[in-house]
Amino acid sequence: MPAVTTTLTPKPKQSILDWISNHWFAAFLIVYGVWVWLPFLAPILMKLGLTTAGNITYFIYSFFCHQLPERSLFFFGEKTMYPLAEIQAAWQDTSNPMILRKFVGNEAMGWKIAWSDRMISFYTSIWLFAFAWWPLRRKLKPVSWWVFALLLLPMIVDGSTHALSDLAGIGLGFRDTNQWLVALTNNALSPAFYAGDALGSFNSWARLISGLLAGLGIVWLAFPYIYQSQGLNQQLNQLNYGVVLEQIKNKNPRAAG
């Protein structure tokens, strides 16, 4: 009986899912980057007169952020942030957060970013820390769970106390005056530091720092694990393909490569 010659076929082409799996970090930077940076375009669109596109952006991101204007950053206006009293004077004299959040700005005050200051700190820090992690990926091990919890704790405490404070009404709660901090520090700092949400205030610093720490914790825990698992999956795929080729060769010594 003549020998049967088997031609080994090349490794099949990658599917889209395989490509994403092998290039997951680039896919993350692009997809998450578009999602996290798009809110910064909202005030630019409004300034350019593209109000429909700008309002659509605000609407989409309203599902991911409270967008309260007194806790948001503004572009193209007199100030970067405005106190609640100025927002109420320009919009409506109300403490209803569902009404306040609809104020996106005007020509004089500028236009707010579709993220609040906390979300800017949290969401963008994940993207930035991920970018910084990549060159260190082979050396940096996942952070321990207790350190991860400690990094999340400031944002949990700050966010939950703000939520409780807002139950008394926007601008009326204990996190709006921070009298507890005045007593704790013996009123050693300026009134502008204790009260309100302006840049440089305690509330502003708390949201900025807690968001950065939470973003650092998420990247430091999740990304090393993802990198390790993706590396193992790629090695497993190569091993499986190599085993199949070896089995074919063993069954047919005259197989042509």
Go through the PLM ranges and name each one.
Residues W19, P135-V143:
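Membrane-interface helix-boundary motifs at transmembrane edges
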Residues T124-F129, S210-Y225:
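Hydrophobic cores of alpha-helical transmembrane segments in multi-pass inner/ER membrane proteins
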Residues Q230-A255:
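Short, highly charged, low-complexity non-transmembrane loops/tails of multi-pass membrane proteins
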